[in-house]
């Protein structure tokens, strides 16, 4: 049973995830593994009256572990054996508010997510600006020429941010070669579109860097084998 895997003190083959979720007093979070073939539920974890929790899990291999408050509100961690992943955030918006300590590769994923969040905020601002000018046009307060000029400007900002997000992923993969975190970076999106295209030369090299780095460091890891297929 899953519960049998939650054994405190097995430092050599387990990790602990703990922390405080503000606004989550007496609620329940859940932990799942993001396995090569998809998510696998591990266990529900109750929060106490202060929103605090602690849970120890025996890992069969290095993998990603998602902590959920709801189906769509979660964070991704990448613990190593013996680590205590210390998480803090808000219940209503964990994915945007969380911080993490005690696990270097979980911190890498946090940094990656922070950059993604910045891009998402800019994208939302651009959409709001576009909608605002469309409403002004309908109200007769601006001309079509003004709307077109604003669209050219926001389109330029969009392309610049998309390119920055892409360059960040390239740099992340290069600087963290051999880390499983590069798998998450590889599939990052901007405006629901993949940033890395394995069919162009730069994207192909990025995929190769991830594949070769993982084969060197984690040749027997299921994530490495799955990615190499």
Model-derived regions, located:
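Sec-dependent bacterial lipoprotein signal peptides
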Residues: 1-8
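Short coil/turn connectors between adjacent alpha-helices in alpha-solenoid helical repeat scaffolds
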Residues: 156, 194-203
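A general alpha-helix detector
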Residues: 168, 188, 209-213
């Amino acid at each position: 049973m899953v519960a049998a895997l939650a054994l405190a003190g097995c430092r050599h083959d387990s990790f602990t995830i703990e922390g405080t979720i503000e606004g989550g007093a007496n609620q329940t979070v859940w932990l799942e593994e993001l396995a090569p073939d998809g998510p696998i539920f591990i266990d529900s974890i109750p929060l106490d009256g202060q929103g605090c929790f602690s849970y120890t899990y025996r890992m069969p291999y290095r993998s990603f572990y998602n902590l959920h408050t709801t189906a769509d509100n979660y964070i991704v961690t990448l613990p190593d054996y013996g680590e205590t992943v210390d998480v803090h955030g808000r219940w209503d918006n964990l994915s945007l508010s969380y911080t993490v300590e005690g696990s270097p590769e979980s911190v890498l994923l946090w940094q990656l997510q922070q950059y993604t969040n910045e891009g998402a905020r800019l994208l939302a601002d651009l959409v709001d600006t576009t909608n605002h000018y469309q409403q002004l046009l309908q109200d007769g307060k601006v001309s079509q020429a003004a709307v077109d000029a604003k669209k050219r400007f926001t389109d330029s900002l969009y392309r610049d941010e998309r390119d920055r997000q892409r360059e960040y992923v390239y740099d992340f993969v290069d600087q963290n070669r051999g880390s499983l975190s590069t798998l998450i970076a590889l599939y990052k999106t901007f405006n629901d579109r993949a940033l890395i295209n394995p069919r162009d030369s730069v994207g192909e090299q990025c995929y190769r860097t991830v594949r070769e780095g993982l084969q060197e460091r984690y040749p027997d890891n299921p994530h490495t084998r799955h990615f190499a297929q």
